[in-house]
C-alpha cells in the first residue's frame, strides 16, 4: 500500500472517494444501489486497486444475515431505467418523465425532477447570477468556489456593473450562466 506522500492528487482523491463511499455503504440503513455500483466501478477501473479498500465489512441488502438489520433489496425495476412497462415486479407504478424517460417510484420525485427541464430558472444566485430550477440546488451552490469563480468571470468580462446584471437576471427569471 502506498503512503500518502507517495501519491499524486488523483490517487489521493480516488482513495478518499472510495473510503467515503465505503463508509456510506457500510451503514446499517438502506444502501443506495448507485453508491454500490460506483464503488464497484472505481474498484474495477482504477489502477489504484491497492489504494482502494475492499469492503469486507460492507453490508449487502437482501442477504439473510442483514434482513434482521432492516436492509431490504430494492427490485432492479425501481433502480434502473426500465423498458416499456410502468410497473415494477411487485406491481408498484413507476412514473415516467415525458422529456427524458427517467422513471420514478413516487410521483413527487417525478414532479421535483421535471423542474430540471424548465426554461425559467426562478432561483438565481444573488452573488454570481447563475440560475437554478430548484431552491435546494441554489443552496448547495451558494458560497462555493464555483460561485466565486462565476462572479469573477462576470466582473472581468464586461464594463457593466455585475450587481445590475444580477438584479436584471433575478427580475427576468433567467440566469446569467
Curated annotation (Swiss-Prot):
Give the Pfam families listed for this entry.
Answer: zf-C2H2 (PF00096)
Name the Gene Ontology molecular function terms of this record.
cis-regulatory region sequence-specific DNA binding; DNA-binding transcription factor activity, RNA polymerase II-specific; zinc ion binding
Mind listing the UniProt keywords for this protein, alphabetically?
Answer: Cytoplasm, DNA-binding, Metal-binding, Nucleus, Transcription, Transcription regulation, Zinc, Zinc-finger
- Name the InterPro entries on file: Znf_C2H2_sf, Znf_C2H2_type
SMART domains per record = ZnF_C2H2
Where is the protein situated, by its record's location annotation?
Answer: Cytoplasm; Nucleus
The Gene Ontology biological process annotation of the record reads: negative regulation of transcription by RNA polymerase II; positive regulation of transcription by RNA polymerase II; regulation of sulfur amino acid metabolic process; regulation of sulfur metabolic process; regulation of transcription by RNA polymerase II
Top-level lineage group: Eukaryota
This protein's assembly is summarised as:
Interacts with MET4 and MET28.
- Additional info? Present with 521 molecules/cell in log phase SD medium.
User: What protein name is recorded for this chain?
Assistant: Transcriptional regulator MET31
Which species is the source of this protein? Saccharomyces cerevisiae (strain ATCC 204508 / S288c) (Baker's yeast)
The record lists the lineage as: Eukaryota, Fungi, Dikarya, Ascomycota, Saccharomycotina
Gene name as annotated: MET31
